[in-house]
Amino acid sequence: MGLLEFNKLPINTLVGADWKTFKAITAGREIDPAYRGKYRLTKAVCRLLSTLAPLQEKRYRKLLADKPLEHDPVFILGHWRSGTTFMHNVFSCDKHFGYNTTYQTVFPHLMMWGQPFFKENMSWLMPDKRPTDNMELAVDLPQEEEFALANMMPYTYYNFWFLPKYQQEYADKYLLFNDISDEELKVFEDIFTKLIKISLWNTGGTQFLSKNPPHTGRVKELVKMFPNAKFIYLMRNPYTVFESTRNFFTNTIQPLKLEDISPEALEQNVLSIYAKLYHKYEADKQFIPEGNLMEVKFEDFEADAMAMTEHIYKSLSIPGFEAAAPAISQYIGGKKGYKKNKYKYDDRTVRLVEENWKFALDQWGYSI
């Protein structure tokens, strides 16, 4: 148990942003009175820590900037709460993979300089379980990279955690890339490539393993960046995904937000953005070369993760399963008995899913 409770954090994750990014994200946005103290403290810590960012930038340019990637990444896609974290943890047992860590999500500019000191303090302060679902939390565990990207540039969907009134705007522009400018897209390409190189350097891997739900809406751009990337798309019962996402977003946003959003508005955003993400993926998966995409139901993966992992490796021609199998088996064995949240779907939840997400129920063959 960490020193601080997640929902009582006096600052939010923008403390790890560079100063230029912090200013760009918050410029022209009104901070609600209840959060101005958190905003000011976050701003002050960010301003202080960002003075250290040039130290990493110097090392990055010297060691990594001109070094090409050995392999295109493997991307685990799927809407939030579709089981992507479990799959990410399973695949990351393979040491040829490199990944973004929990520490890196908050302090992406303090990776190549100062990491031991700041990581030790973060480990001491943070909880050891994810408050929404009891999944383990630790500074060196694999983590999705969107929070790290949000601290490296202002062009990410996760700005909505801080400014939720603009969630739909951020979704259209930075989740789906519908309204993004060429200049913003170039920044995304450069910063994401930089994050990948630092992640591989940090974890010692040779191929980047990404678990990042927002990438589900960016398939066309990702294929352009990485023509031979492999994609695993996870599907899960939409009733479970809705209930779990609503719970996850409602709880996670509390210590991060700098303005209020009503539960009703957040719920409507979950419903509409799920549909946007679903249709964007369905439209753009055609750009993935044949043999580089595998679509998997999470329920099938969860039922026999070992066999399914081997099947995915072989289907996508990912090397190294035999060498990684003992570590993967050990991790999966350690998850037996893990208590997941149990959801009961009331009549209203069932109605909302059936009215808004019938397309997914029908295509994937799910029912209550």
What residues fall within each predicted segment?
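N-terminal signal-anchor transmembrane helix
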Residues: 55-74, 105-109, 114-115
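PAPS-dependent sulfation machinery
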Residues: 106-208
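Post-Walker A helix-loop "phosphate-sensing" segment adjacent to the P-loop in P-loop NTPases
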Residues: 93-103
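PAPS-dependent sulfotransferases, especially Golgi type II membrane carbohydrate sulfotransferases
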Residues: 1-56, 64, 173-178, 183-189, ...
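Glycine-rich phosphate-binding P-loop
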Residues: 76-93
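Conserved phosphate-donor/acceptor-positioning beta-strand/loop module used by diverse small-molecule
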Residues: 211, 222-247
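Ligand-binding pocket scaffold of soluble enzyme catalytic domains
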Residues: 196, 209-211, 219, 305, ...
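Short His-Asn-centered micro-motif
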Residues: 77-79, 209-213, 298
